[in-house]
């Protein structure tokens, strides 16, 4: 029987196996940020240990930094965490993309754009959405703080091998429908626990047609379906994306051959298989308090509901059977590790060019990294957004989570391109609706959700 992509990635990294069936995996890349690393570094300090492979470790500041005035950090805890990361990286000789550095940005944005993320690697980070890097054919997953310490000290991690789920995506995406809508559709249909104990492998003609940034969006939210990770076999688009980046391999031809071996064999069998035709897919909007509580923009909110739905309706201030078009939007956030890359900003800019944000709506665009920000400004996207009435910010996690100054006031609704809509995720009492960049941009113009498929934009932008 053939091997799945998961099998090939896993077997290449097993150092040892214990009596409980756990495998000790070698870790090729460890990404670090300011929130989940302080206790891990302190653990090394208390036991007089060093970081075993600082050359395979890379740190950045993203969660706590303000995006409006990055040099004016007023929150005491946030400043302490940022200062602590800076001190730890200096003491343990870990490379750091500090505030103001040209390489700084959201950890899951800078990894790929710097060429740190590569096919065949095992990648970990003390962050749930490490699955993003699986878009490159890497086995990437989030870990806890004690595991962060273990990897810092040993460059290994004990893990139990997950099962493999194959998700085949067939057909061509309609105009106005994106990778974000695919994953929201999957979550609404199969729930937030379907992937528990699995690694999701996305494949099929739809995947082949996607660019790398769309694939990253898809893998980013595999964790929202309960999966350990999301992966996509590398192809010519993967190779072209990685080639020439700062930390990309120099022996390109030899490494390219190794990457070409990373795929699921034709005679391999998944532990669970799902097939979805995307041809008739529509833009999605979440209405509740987990990412599976979503509907097509042309559907009404569910009439039948259970106790969890009842709580969600109450928290969100919505009613069963309500039209998605009637959901008010007071805030719009375009950013996060899900949708803050250049192509995301281009799509949003193409929607708002020459138009104005609805009076009373606060709209933010937060690029995922300094490099994304610079590239967007080179193309004039910042002017398009600012002329429309958006705030153009510095890179950071921003409004994705309520642990920095960018928050949604209690009881107000936000159209967000982020990945989680839990209670209080964007601030106490904040009401989060997950959507694609195109849908978020359109909501900013109207002050409520609209069907982007009916708007006059072509998904591409003219910079004239």
From Swiss-Prot:
UniProt superkingdom: Bacteria
Key words of the record: 4Fe-4S, Amino-acid biosynthesis, Branched-chain amino acid biosynthesis, Iron, Iron-sulfur, Leucine biosynthesis, Lyase, Metal-binding
GN (gene name): leuC
Role this protein plays: Catalyzes the isomerization between 2-isopropylmalate and 3-isopropylmalate, via the formation of 2-isopropylmaleate.
InterPro entries linked to this entry: 3-IsopropMal_deHydase_lsu, Acnase/IPM_dHydase_lsu_aba_1/3, Acoase/IPM_deHydtase_lsu_aba, Aconitase_4Fe-4S_BS, Aconitase_4Fe-4S_dom, IPM_dehydratase_rel_enz, IPMI_cat
GO biological process: L-leucine biosynthetic process
Pathways per UniProt: Amino-acid biosynthesis; L-leucine biosynthesis; L-leucine from 3-methyl-2-oxobutanoate: step 2/4
PROSITE patterns membership: ACONITASE_1, ACONITASE_2
Gene3D superfamilies, per database record: Aconitase, domain 3
Quaternary state and interactors: Heterodimer of LeuC and LeuD.
Protein name: 3-isopropylmalate dehydratase large subunit
Catalytic activity: (2R,3S)-3-isopropylmalate = (2S)-2-isopropylmalate
Pfam families in the record: Aconitase (PF00330)
Disulfide bonding pattern of the chain: none
Similarity-based family: Belongs to the aconitase/IPM isomerase family. LeuC type 1 subfamily.
Annotated SUPFAM superfamilies: Aconitase iron-sulfur domain (SSF53732)
Enzymatic class: lyase
EC number: 4.2.1.33
Cofactor note: Binds 1 [4Fe-4S] cluster per subunit.
Database matches in NCBIfam families: leuC, PRK05478.1, PRK12466.1
Binding of [4Fe-4S] cluster, residues: 337, 397, 400
Cofactor dependency: [4Fe-4S] cluster
One MF annotation (Gene Ontology) recorded for this entry: 3-isopropylmalate dehydratase activity
């Amino acid at each position: 029987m053939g091997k799945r992509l998961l099998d090939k990635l896993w077997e290449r990294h097993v150092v040892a196996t214990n009596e409980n069936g756990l495998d000790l995996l070698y870790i090729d890349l460890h990404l670090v940020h300011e929130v989940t690393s302080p206790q891990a570094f302190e653990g090394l300090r208390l036991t007089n240990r060093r970081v075993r492979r600082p050359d395979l470790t890379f740190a950045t500041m993203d969660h706590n930094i303000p995006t409006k005035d990055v040099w004016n950090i007023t929150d005491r805890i946030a400043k302490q965490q940022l200062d602590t990361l800076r001190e730890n990286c200096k003491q343990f000789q870990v490379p750091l993309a500090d505030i103001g550095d040209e390489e700084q940005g959201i950890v899951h944005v800078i990894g790929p754009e710097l060429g740190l993320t590569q096919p065949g690697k095992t990648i970990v980070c003390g962050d749930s959405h490490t699955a993003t890097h699986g878009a490159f054919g890497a086995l990437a997953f989030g870990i806890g703080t004690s595991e962060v310490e273990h990897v810092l000290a040993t460059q290994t991690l004990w893990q139990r091998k997950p099962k493999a789920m194959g998700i085949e995506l067939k057909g061509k995406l309609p105009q106005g429908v994106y990778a974000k809508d695919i994953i929201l559709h999957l979550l609404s249909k199969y729930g937030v626990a379907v992937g528990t104990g699995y690694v999701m492998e996305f494949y099929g003609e739809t995947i082949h047609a996607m660019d790398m940034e769309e694939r990253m969006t898809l893998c980013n939210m595999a964790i929202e379906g309960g999966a350990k990770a999301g992966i996509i076999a590398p192809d010519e688009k993967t190779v072209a994306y990685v080639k020439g980046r700062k930390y990309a391999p120099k022996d390109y031809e030899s490494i390219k051959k190794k990457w070409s071996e990373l795929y699921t064999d034709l005679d391999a069998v998944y532990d669970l298989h799902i097939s979805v035709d995307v041809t008739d897919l529509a833009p999605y909007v979440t209405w509740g308090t987990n990412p599976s509580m979503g509907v097509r923009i042309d559907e009404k909110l569910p009439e039948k509901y259970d106790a969890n739905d009842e709580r969600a309706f109450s928290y969100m201030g919505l009613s069963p059977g309500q039209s998605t078009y009637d959901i008010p939007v007071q805030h719009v956030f375009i950013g996060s590790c899900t949708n803050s890359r250049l192509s995301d900003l281009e799509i949003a800019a193409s929607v708002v060019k020459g138009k104005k944000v609805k009076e009373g709506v606060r709209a933010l665009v937060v690029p995922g990294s300094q490099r994304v920000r610079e590239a967007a400004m080179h193309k004039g996207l910042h002017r398009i957004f600012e002329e429309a009435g958006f705030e153009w910010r510095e890179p950071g996690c921003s409004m994705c989570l309520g642990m920095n100054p960018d928050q949604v006031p209690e009881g107000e609704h936000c159209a967000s391109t982020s990945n989680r809509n839990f209670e209080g995720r964007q601030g106490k009492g904040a009401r989060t609706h997950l959507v694609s960049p195109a849908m978020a941009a359109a909501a900013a113009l109207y002050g409520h959700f609209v069907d982007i498929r009916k708007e006059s934009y072509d998904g591409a932008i003219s910079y004239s």
